[in-house]
């Protein structure tokens, strides 16, 4: 029974350390900034590409605005 317990326990410890390392690496205090890159006719791949050019860690998304247009928003960590 010990042989089954030890590898499972070691795997659990390694997994826990990895998860805590990833979660600990995230910045809780970091605010998110948004920039409108295109006012209408957003294409997802184009929006994502423009956002990555603006900020290498940015995430471009096409969303529907309050005026009914599909706009490109770029989300990134504020400087």
Swiss-Prot record:
InterPro entries: DEFL
Compartments, record wording: Secreted
Residues that span the membrane, as ranges: none
Intrachain S-S bonds: 33-78, 42-62, 47-72, 51-74
Pfam families (UniProt xref): SLR1-BP (PF07333)
Taxonomic superkingdom: Eukaryota
GO cellular component: extracellular region
Keyword Disulfide bond included in the entry's annotation: yes
Family: Belongs to the DEFL family.
Protein name (record): Putative defensin-like protein 137
Organism: Arabidopsis thaliana (Mouse-ear cress)
Organism lineage: Eukaryota, Viridiplantae, Streptophyta, Embryophyta, Tracheophyta
Gene: LCR14
